[in-house]
Amino acid sequence: MTNRPTDFWNTDLPELLGGLAANANGLTQTEAEARLERYGRNLLDTTNRRSSIRQYLAHFKNPLVLILLVASGLSALMGEVEGAWIIWSIVLLSVTLDFFQEHRAEHAANLLKKQVAVRATVLRNGQPVEIRLEKIVPGDIVLLNAGALVPADCRLLDAKDFFVNQSVLTGETFPVEKHATSLTEATHEFSEADNAVFMGTSVVSGIATALVCSTGERTALGDIAETLTRQPPPTRFELGLQSFGQLIMRLTIFLVLFVFLINAVFQRPLLESFLFSIALAVGLTPELLPMIVTLTLSRGAIRLSKKHVIVKKLSAIEDLGGMDVLCTDKTGTLTEARIRLERHVNALGEDSAEVLRLAYLNSCFESGLRSPLDDAILDHHELDAPIAAENWTKVDEVPFDFERRRVSVLITRQGQRQLIVKGAPEDVLKHCTQWQAGDDIRPLTDDDRQRIKRLHHQLGSQGFKVLGIAWRNVPSTHDHAVIDDETELTFAGFAGFLDPPKQSAAAAIKTLTASGVSVRILTGDSEEVTRYVCNLIGMPVSGVLLGRDVSAMDDASLAARIRDVNLFCRINPAEKKRIILAFKQLGHTVGYLGDGINDAPSLHAADVGISVDTAVDVAREAADLILLEQDLNVICRGVSEGRRTTTNIMKYIMMGTSSNFGNMFSMAAATLFLPFLPLLPAQVLLNNLLYDLSEFPIPMDNVDSETLQKPQHWDIGFIRNFMWTAGPVSSLFDFMTFGVMLWVFKANEALFHTGWFVESLATQVLAIFIIRTAGSAWKSRPNPWLAATSIGVVLLTCLIPFTPLASALGFEPLPPLFFAILAGMVLSYLILLEIVKRLFYRHMAKQST
């Protein structure tokens, strides 16, 4: 059988095993490696990965770069060979530096992602081993359980209470039960193949052993990948980049057309004017921005990895820096997630070994995703497990789901059949008609219900997480358990669990709150338990909403109600998602921390989906960030790093839209009164290249502690206002330079070009020391590398007119007096820019209050 999408579910199992040369013990490691070479990696290549050479060449696809290369080629054909070579060399150097930095950054980020890649358990040499999904091959035997992602198209060999979510393929969100049996009727529709599971689907409950039949692009998912592939909605950061790009493009088009038309009116050489216009466009275009963004984000990802946070989606770092609401469960964040069974009481509140026995039998035979509560029951020190389960065997099960909030197992012993139900107390109690008092079974009156509810609340107020336990006998011929069996139950009692509060939680919540991040608890626990834990750690409760309240509200009412609520109790997964979307509707940047099987929708809905490395596969796959330890302090450190990363990206953007824009505007305006071009095209490109070189260390720059104390949001309005404020300051000193060169030095064309080239680059580059901080430039220390490259580029610029390259570039040596004037002008420019910056931030602060 070949590895392609076939109706393998219709094939007899012995024939299928024979065709794949497989058996129930799995493949040998040697055979698996040979098949990996033969079939290729188990990947959907929808990303169209490119070789390094193609990635490098893609940098030349920038329309402005292409126009520049073509135009300079025409210039060479007309005899301007030297100028053309200079332009080509500068473009080549700029593109090469850009590619090298971006490629290295992406490589580092991809290495980090591999640390948290989803893995699968397969049989190799007869033993279960964990391998990366991409190494699975046809013929492998895969072990599947609740929470796992199905790694390939597989035929089931064995399945027990096995339910799968196939919505990625069918759009149907309700779980489908699968069986390890032959189909009674052949079908060509994979949605009707009840004995097969498919790549990309997820296991909701149960366990199974499966034979891999198709991998990678030959799976059902791979066959329709192009129709399924949808770009995720852009993040706030990505939308901000798009808006910024549109702003720059509009300015660039206006200035380029203006300059070209002015030169045409003055009857200057058209080709040279065209080259100058395009060079001006290159100078205005922040072509280094993609590299700066990638490099800054990847460096942020590397720093986050050292703080136990692995980044799967780079743009999520910026959203982490802007996060102002964090939604999280109580368990593992406010508590230690070390759950112990402390109480097992009957309906009268008395300790009961019978309640413990029933709870044990339910947890022992449950085959779905075993919760920490099940583990606590099975590990309980008072329990004699062999005696408790003696001679009992399982018949069937109704798996847990978040609508019923309970799980039932049907067991049998010596002709007796019993259904044992365990779940949320209120959901168990409402299906009971009797209660157990020792050996007596009594009718459940309204007074009994109220007494049992009071007992439940009493346990909750003492910090116990409570499960209700009930049972009923069924006929010995009853072979299948269904939801309708969960009626006329006998209430046995409660199992009470304690999860000690996490000592670090209080300090972490205070740190997050002081940093502008509001922590909201979304839990399935009762209000009493959640309040108890919050009181222990000193977390004030500002408001409470229950799941039933959330479900009764429409979206608008929910958004209006949640502003001051920080506890959401008895919440199911659908309600969690609605709460997250409501916070987003209010304009918040929302993070969600989840690790459960039904947390994927909420992780997708949040701006920042956060999970832990011990989470189920579906949660880890849906998350943007993976925590290597479940601790709010890790998120505190992550938020700080996200803000640092965002701030450094903003520094480059604000540099490009202030001093750089001011210089390019001056260049355009100078064409109105100069009898020659303000700078030659090659000089404009060299100016741009040297400026870019000075900006390379921005991703490593230090960030003021004050900046790290508040969310850093992308704000295109802020950028635009800063451009119109700081840009004219740069232009003012450019025009002063024009006056000095024309009236003091009586400069010819070459000397004018040289003087303004040096001054424009000096002011443009050194402005970073002012713009990089919202506070005092004299008190904020830049990264040494940034300081060194900035000063180094300015010194290099001053030396270029005295090098052998000067004549080729159209420069000539400057008189000593020029440098004295330059020093005074640069100092004056930086002082004025600092004053204007402070006034700008003061004005913006008043507007925001």
Please identify what each model-predicted range represents.
Residues R41-G73, E106, Q127-V129, T187-A196, ...:
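Soluble-to-membrane junctions at the N-terminal ends of transmembrane alpha-helices
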Residues L255, V259, P290, V541-Y592, ...:
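Membrane-embedded transport module
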Residues E82, I86-A117, R124, P232-T328, ...:
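Hydrophobic alpha-helical transmembrane segments
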Residues M1-P128, E134-V137, V142-V150, R155-F163, ...:
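Non-lumenal N-terminal regulatory segments of integral membrane proteins
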Residues F163, L169-T170, A180-T184, E336-L358, ...:
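Basic, amphipathic juxtamembrane/active-site segments
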Residues L66-S89, L247-T285, S298, I302-H308, ...:
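Helix-interface capping motifs at the ends of transmembrane segments in multi-pass membrane proteins
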Residues A58-L77, V91-D98, V118, Q246-A264, ...:
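Alpha-helical transmembrane segments of multi-pass membrane proteins
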Residues A196-V204, D319-T490, F497, K510-T511, ...:
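Cytosolic catalytic regions of ATP/NTP-dependent phosphoryl-transfer enzymes
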